[in-house]
């Protein structure tokens, strides 16, 4: 699901760019027969201020905003990521806005906590989750070589739950798949460069 989401949501952004279409509007056009997905996407766009200009960074910095939408475990999640990219290609994910339709949210605080945790987990994979082999053996043996994100890498996360009367659906993992494509799409918006492999590397985005 995570790999599928990255492939489909980054490619949709490529198509939107080639068609000179807004990425959110482009997706909404294709969701006319999927009102649940459209509602989640519209909510995240509204809460993220998608239609408003993104605040400029410091001199030499490039900023971008990206979106992704995905369904897994019966739950629909849309995310908007905002990034700041330095001249040397290093970048920071500043903010992630998420909208989630998981049916009836029996415990809204738990839903928010799960989404926040999923963003952290997914960002770790997107930035640091590379597995390499040497002589048929995985080289990463501990957290020193396979690092989770540090607290300074964690973005501000906002979670918005769609009011629903439908039966509850999964919330443990559905916010993981859209994160990497949302960040990659934001980086493309900021730099004009597409990341065709994960994890996302500084070298890909140098000015």
Segments the model singles out, each with a brief description of its role:
Residues 1-207:
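Cofactor-binding beta-sheet edge motifs in enzyme active sites
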